[in-house]
């Protein structure tokens, strides 16, 4: 199974890429994590956030591999515990279907992206920088995989 993080944003601070890679490279091939970056919409004086989100959404959805399960990261989604992430990861691995995690840009995801998703995942009730979300997702996927495989990285009480 492959997990794709398809995210709006390029040329982010180096620490974001390093943080993401730290966790992505720890995962084995049977649960690989790949990042696909989408250029943000051009934000000019004549544009509007709704137009920018729609443009980014079209390009995000165009990057989704066929027959993938799509989960959109959105503050209005469901909050999952670490154990719930592990449970879902196990289901995804059993199904053998690739999974896509969508991350919007600074203005979030357009309604079409949310409608096309099979699920909405809220990482926090806080508003998080979209670059930081990449690192959090990679760490949580690695933590869930560690939990499923009884690796000492995850220390539950």
Curated annotation (Swiss-Prot):
The lineage of its organism: Bacteria, Pseudomonadati, Pseudomonadota, Gammaproteobacteria, Chromatiales. Its main location: cytoplasm. Its EC number is 2.1.1.177. S-adenosyl-L-methionine binds at residues 104, 123-128. Belongs to the RNA methyltransferase RlmH family. GO terms for cellular component: cytoplasm. InterPro entries: Alpha/beta_knot_MTases, RlmH-like, tRNA_m1G_MTases_N. The keyword Endoplasmic reticulum does not apply. Homodimer. CDD domains: RlmH-like. It is found in: Cytoplasm. Keywords: Cytoplasm, Methyltransferase, rRNA processing, S-adenosyl-L-methionine, Transferase. SUPFAM superfamilies: alpha/beta knot. It comes from Nitrosococcus oceani (strain ATCC 19707 / BCRC 17464 / JCM 30415 / NCIMB 11848 / C-107). Specifically methylates the pseudouridine at position 1915 (m3Psi1915) in 23S rRNA. One of its GO terms (molecular function) is rRNA (pseudouridine-N3-)-methyltransferase activity. Pfam families: SPOUT_MTase. This is Ribosomal RNA large subunit methyltransferase H. It catalyses: pseudouridine(1915) in 23S rRNA + S-adenosyl-L-methionine = N(3)-methylpseudouridine(1915) in 23S rRNA + S-adenosyl-L-homocysteine + H(+). The gene is rlmH.
